[in-house]
């Protein structure tokens, strides 16, 4: 990971038409290779924030720089080569007549050669277990499959930054696990992963950094453990503890004070306690 931010915001403020303030004075530096969760209650500004990262929204005040490019003067098409965005609702970005067409559309827009289109589309569809359905119409897919198709269409572009907006919505357990394991693989390969989510179990298990939004402001920027130990932040935002952390808190009455966030951490803590 380098010290140079791939995403930089300074005094980022944004108001929707009608002077509805959605973001206020957000200062962030996100570096290449981070896995960042962006959390907060509905209306806290999470999705509005990440829509500034590929130019879908432009700051009312302040600025956003993506790999050094000021989004106010950079085309969305250029920013989309850096930041891939998978929307919460897959139907907002699916419009082709076959799974293959949808997954390869962005590559064709970039005028990539036929061999590269074939290879990258195939790899992306295999990664989300949709290659066998490549000739099917997207509307014939389940919602979970359409979510995976939307993910594949962005994966095919090989952008250095991947934004996942509620990535496991509508997914069964196996599909949820598959998408998150894919995010982990991309992160391990050096991609920057930003995950907007209400699911604190995902935050606890996968994120290395958490940005907490409240009323358009980033009120906390810390590790998952630090966030889930901060009762003031949890209470003021309505965030819930992940299930394992709840169990760990219940063990405090038995003299086990360690904050654990994942099942493996909890098992290790219990084994250590039993040995003493």
Task: Outline where the language-model segments fall.
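Conserved ABC ATPase "signature" C-loop
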Residues: 215-216
């Amino acid at each position: 990971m380098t010290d140079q931010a791939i995403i930089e915001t300074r005094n980022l403020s944004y108001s929707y038409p009608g002077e509805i303030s959605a973001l206020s004075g957000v200062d962030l530096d996100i570096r290449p290779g981070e896995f960042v969760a962006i959390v907060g209650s509905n209306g806290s500004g999470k999705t509005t924030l990440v829509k500034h990262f590929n130019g879908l929204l432009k700051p009312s005040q302040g600025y956003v720089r993506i790999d050094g490019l000021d989004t106010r003067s950079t085309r969305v098409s250029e920013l989309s080569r850096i930041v891939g965005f998978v929307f919460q609702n897959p139907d907002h970005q699916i419009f082709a007549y076959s799974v293959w067409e949808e997954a390869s559309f962005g590559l064709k827009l970039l005028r990539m050669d036929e061999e590269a289109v074939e290879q990258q589309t195939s790899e992306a569809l295999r990664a989300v277990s949709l290659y066998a359905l490549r000739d099917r119409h997207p509307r014939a897919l389940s919602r979970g499959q359409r979510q995976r198709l939307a993910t594949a269409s962005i994966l095919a572009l090989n952008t250095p930054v991947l934004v996942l907006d509620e990535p496991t919505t509508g997914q069964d357990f196996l599909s949820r696990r598959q998408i998150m394991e894919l995010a982990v693989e991309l992160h391990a390969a050096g991609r920057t992963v930003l995950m907007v989510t209400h699911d604190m179990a995902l935050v606890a298990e996968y994120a290395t950094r958490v940005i907490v939004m409240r009323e358009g402001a980033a009120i906390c920027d810390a590790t998952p453990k630090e966030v889930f130990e901060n009762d003031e932040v949890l209470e003021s935002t309505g965030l819930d503890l992940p299930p394992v952390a709840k169990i760990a808190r219940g063990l405090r009455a038995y003299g086990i004070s360690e904050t654990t966030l994942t099942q493996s951490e909890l098992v290790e803590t219990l084994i250590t306690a039993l040995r003493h």
